A protein has these predicted regions:
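Class II aminoacyl-tRNA synthetase catalytic cores and aaRS-like
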Residues: 1-178
């Protein structure tokens, strides 16, 4: 178990109050830019995404060497101070890193994304990781359904699930979709 204390969206929304403060976040490593003894990585949690600066002098050589073997898609935890880069991007200067879960399959390339419609529908989990607009659509759908259910529940209605496709005939000669 990794005890994080901040979501990435809290850092970006309240940067003035958070600047210089030590934070602990956990999320999926979405990209890495290697610059020798320093790396910039993007970490996405359930509420947003933030850039993190990882330097060998700050995390230690053993930790940094282990970090270099991690893959895009791995779930990591890190702690560090919030700062702004020279270009003005809100970031975390990491002082410790921890691998929380290994990604068994690689994520699609960042710039090409996941474009194949068949793959997007068959591997919905991947679509939700790679395409934030798809995730936003699912979140909105969930909120709408929650409000409709709350309204109807308040009026005394009950919810009944009715199956849409049910095999009524079972066996070798059954032809339910004719």
């Amino acid at each position: 178990k990794y005890d994080f204390d901040t979501y990435t969206s809290d850092i970006t929304a309240n940067f003035e109050a958070m600047e210089g403060r030590e934070v602990r976040i956990a999320g999926r490593m979405m990209s890495r830019r290697d610059m020798g003894k320093a790396n910039f990585i993007d970490v996405a949690d359930g509420k947003g995404r933030i850039q993190c600066y990882v330097r060998v002098d700050d995390v230690g050589e053993d930790c940094f060497n282990a970090f270099k073997k991690w893959d895009i898609g791995d779930i990591i935890g890190l702690s560090g101070k919030v700062f702004s880069t020279r270009r003005g991007e809100i970031s975390i200067h990491a002082d410790s890193l921890e691998l929380l879960a290994k990604s068994l399959l690689p994520l699609p390339e960042k710039y090409h994304g996941l474009k194949d419609t068949d793959t997007r529908y068959r591997q919905r989990y991947l679509d939700l990781i790679v395409n934030p607009e798809v995730k936003d659509t699912f979140i909105q759908r969930s909120q709408i359904l929650r409000e409709i259910r709350a309204y109807l529940d308040g009026k005394g209605y009950i919810e009944v699930d009715t199956p849409i496709l049910v095999p009524l005939e079972i066996g070798a000669s059954a032809r339910p979709f004719v």
